[in-house]
Amino acid sequence: MAGEKGGSRDEEREPLTRGSIEFRDSINSFDYSSSTASLSLAVIDRINGSTQDSRLGEKDQRDDDHDQYRNEEEYDVEDADYIPSGGKTVQKTTKIVLWALLFLCVGGWSLAFVIFLFRGHDTPQTSIASEENISSGGARGNRITLDEVLGGEWAPRAHSISWFPGPNGEDGLILEKDNLSATAYLRVEDIVGRKDPKASKKSIVLMQKKMFTVGRETVYSAQAWPSPDLKTVLVLSDQQKNWRHSFTGKYWLFDVETQTGQPLDPGAPDRRIQLASWSPQSDAVVFTRDNNMFLRKLTSNEVATITTDGGVDLFYGVPDWVYEEEVFSGNSATWWASDGDYIAFLRTNESSVPDYPIQYFASRPSGENPKPGEENYPEVREVKYPKAGAPNPIVDLQFYDVGKGEVFSVDVTSEFADDDRLIIEVLWASNGKALVRETNRESDILSIAIIDVLSRTGRIVRREDVNALDGGWVEPTQSTRFIPADPDHGRLDDGYIDTVIYEGRDQLAYFTPLDNPKPIMLTKGHSEVVNAPSGVDLKRGLVYFVVAGNEPWERHIYSVNFDGTSLQPLTNVTESSYYDVSFSNGAGYALLNYRGPKVPWQKVINTPANENSFEAIIEQNDHLSRKLRLFSLESKVYQHVTVDGFSLPVMERRPPNFDPAKKYPVLFHLYGGPGSQTVSKKFSVDFQSYVASTLGYIVVTVDGRGTGHIGRKARCIIRGNLGHYEARDQIETAKKWAAKPYVDESRMAIWGWSYGGFMTLKTLEQDGGRTFQYGMAVAPVTDWRYYDSIYTERYMRTPQHNQGGYDTSAISNTTALASNIRFLLMHGTADDNVHIQNSLTLLDKLDLDDVDNYDVHVFPDSDHSIYFHNAHKMVYNRLGDWLINAFNGEWLKVHKPTPNNSLFRRAETWGGLPV
């Protein structure tokens, strides 16, 4: 699980269409107009905008969970709003008046918007904010099928451009990969040259083919990372998945000039490596194998050993399970200094962390054959998994002097003991200095230290007691941005940009010099920044960031000067839309992603401060535009409800041809984890769309207290008592819907996956059948003592400090659960994230209290995403069919049933024989 980190990441919610849609366009197909360029790119990463992997919490939401330059429905502020209907000519005087009014309106709007962002507002909207209906198939349009949704037919195609820093400071270089090409598998292109070849260098082909031979071995590239000087490519082959983000494989060095390869470690070419990364100077690669670190310099075939005592319980340079899952959201705990002279890395000791056994009954993920006579026993994988209150891994930050070949540590006076410390971010500055972010185990005290590896000294320069500030917590993020000194551009000292708490919101701040604890505030007001900053233009002194706009379901892009002045939108903020963005290394160009509510599109643009005008379409999703003309989808109504004085965002999905005179069943869908967000303007055709569009039920989603972008007061109130306020918000909202004239209050259900599964059960428990009659919980937490320590203690503190909170948050009131008509519980047996222990212990409580109004489905060998052996299709088929039966009244609440004799028929006979 995780709070919103790097954005509200979809992967924290229930998985629906896990795989990205891979596609390859002609790499040379460009069609330019006078003002725009059409660009088709096959790039290294491809993202499915609807992909939803599975985890509790949102690591931001970069989730994430992507047409023309402008959609046909989209317009600029200058467009046709003041052109008279019928195309009549406007008289000159009228034009002057209209232009004057235009400038007054635009100026007034701009002033009002800046005041809004910087001063905020205290009165949230409580009425219907907007209604979206993206399909145009009409009353007789086709209905979507669940197979179409699960098969990805409604998933927007999206590209993730790999921006690449030029060896000589060039901006706007992109890394492209074409798996089908026999002459340009991997290459670097100057995106400006797509529009004006004379203004660009030619493309550089790094690898002609995807495969190459080394001796007798044929190497197939799975991933590839060019060196910063573009002379060598680090190639991964034989990739094998470990956990969510980690993997192992064989690594190779591929020479661009000769188009030949060699093993990264010539002395052990077949041994699997966990992680490898380039020196910023392109002259060395550091890697971890068998939890020890090594260094290969390109000038030699020799491999230097950095550490020697790594093993089962001791990790160097890579995170263990809980740090990978809950802190870094990645597979690396290694950081190169920008000059390549030093390497920082984590030493993780998990010898005290208890093991959790994961059994595999129908598969052997290890790939190893069982011993003779043990073929019929399940394979068991022991995972070091620290549950709440259990011993945590002990982490230390160490450094390696590349020139001296020496490992050392720097003592920094810390208020955190070894077993009470989390290291959540390491950021190199200049001149041998590194910023290190630490928190206590319960993640409510933040400490930032500066370490000088040249003098081997360090000190704490900033401390924040977040618990004392607002009762909240610190999310582990890695979005802090170093800003080097540049007197020519007005920056006398080094500094960094960080997200801070300011007036109850997450805002951007600039700290300079590095040891200055008092920042320059870059943003203020009602709206909150998201995973900021997104990009920094050092030459022009600009910071780009994403903000949840006038409404929490929006995302817009802005820039601001380093001194906090000249706030400017990069997107059209007059439209209620959802954008995200990635910037080139110099922030002169941006991949702008429009993600909804209309059909998503992508384009590369020049940023406003860049004088070189450029615009190129990357993706239009024409296939979705065509489909939408043939289908009838649900309409989405966005609004707010007020519960206990808190304004909460709600999205209601109404069936096609909605008739307010009818009575509709209602399904509530939720996730609800701390910092997460489910109500958004992103385009999505998912399971909820199927329920509303095809089954004809209303689907309601409310982001209750604890979720993201509704202010820290509403977010932090849940701390220490997960489930209580969140369930109340679901119930109170459901009561409001039950009172609506078009809702059948006798047919109301709720469902969720992961944290949403926990919330489903907690809501049913708290409601006791008074509002909801049915529920469906997939892979739920049922007792927070069973979940991992870093996530759980961030929001619940330790069980030793909050036993009462853990007791009340656990699903334990079986009498209340028995008061519902029926509920469904599903879980994968090999779930390494939310262990099946959660569901099994709940079943034991139900057995002890003779509760039987539920159904159970267990998926052998499936992890938290539930995919193994057709399980993903099965889980959604079961959800849909079970819901239909529930709303059809098939699930009867009958305890100790008796035979219905009226159903017996007397046997008919003929000649004494039964017929």
Curated annotation (Swiss-Prot):
InterPro entries: AB_hydrolase_fold (IPR029058), Peptidase_S9_cat (IPR001375), Peptidase_S9B_N (IPR002469), Serine_Prot_S9B/DPPIV (IPR050278). One of its GO terms (molecular function) is dipeptidyl-peptidase activity. The active site is at S754 (charge relay system), D831 (charge relay system), H864 (charge relay system). It catalyses: Release of an N-terminal dipeptide, Xaa-Yaa-|-Zaa-, from a polypeptide, preferentially when Yaa is Pro, provided Zaa is neither Pro nor hydroxyproline. SUPFAM superfamilies: alpha/beta-Hydrolases (SSF53474), DPP6 N-terminal domain-like (SSF82171). Keywords: Aminopeptidase, Glycoprotein, Hydrolase, Membrane, Protease, Serine protease, Signal-anchor, Transmembrane, Transmembrane helix, Vacuole. One of its GO terms (biological process) is proteolysis. Residues 117-915 are vacuolar. The keyword Protease applies. This is Probable dipeptidyl-aminopeptidase B. The lineage of its organism: Eukaryota, Fungi, Dikarya, Ascomycota, Pezizomycotina. The gene is DAPB.
